[in-house]
Amino acid sequence: MYFRASIFRIWIFTSSLVFSFSCFALIEVTDDLNNKIVLSKPAKRIISLAPNITEILFHIGAGSSIVGADEYSNYPSAAQSIMRVNNHSIANYELIISLQPDLVVAWYSGNGVDIIERLRHLGLPVFVLEISTMDQIPVLYQKLGQLTGSTKKSKEAARLFSERLDELRSNYLGKTKVKSFYQIWDDPIMTLNGKHLVSDVIELCGGENVFLNASPLVPQVNIESIIAANPEVILSSGSEARVKSWRQKWSRWPSINAVRQGHMYLIPPDLMQRQSNRILDGADYVCQFIERYRQDQSSQI
């Protein structure tokens, strides 16, 4: 009888430990807006509200858990079959709720406060990202890896990203600064200030964003201010088919150093506009184009 009673007490004790552990083994992650997201288990039904988020989730091994995505999520190809729940300014809240997500991942400057707050008001856990530097990306991988249970692959992705980033840094460290202008729209002319990830890429390559201190994040600038800044390299995103017409527009202002010397370059759009793992490929282009200017100057000495 004593033996049985002892076994019973041990069973009760160990069961209570297991129960306590299950109660307290919560997943807690802080997002880029300093909000804490708490999940009782890894998310398996995820809503991605932006294409960069979709790319990252696939990259860290959580793509199969995405049940809803924005209409621009087209990479990788597996993303094209996912249910569409939003565009950049409108979300289908009824559809999102019907998909019973256990996690929503949003992009602050891309989706906006209204959509994010509405989803939170509906009781959904929303992780918000807002990347302004390259160093934030491997950290983001690991945070999303925790939330999705894809910790092993996310750590490996973070390691590989950091290694490649460090290699780029070492290649261009100490190089002569090159005044650079990044155009995202032509009518009106718009650019990106120093708080945007693209500006960090330019700096990584030894460039200097001529509108570093402008405001807001995406400022509208006039041609007079560009002439005054006199960039040595002008960058934008677009296809090869657009290069000729784009350069032709700039040819009206030959007083700008970049125009006069022909240092105007287009980068494949998704590589720079999406804050995902492919930003490193975009950075390769930026660094090569800025380096062309340096080499051109060296050859003229």
Where are these regions (language model features)?
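Structured C-terminal subdomain patch of bacterial secreted/periplasmic proteins
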Residues: A91, Q136-V139, K143-Q146, K155, ...
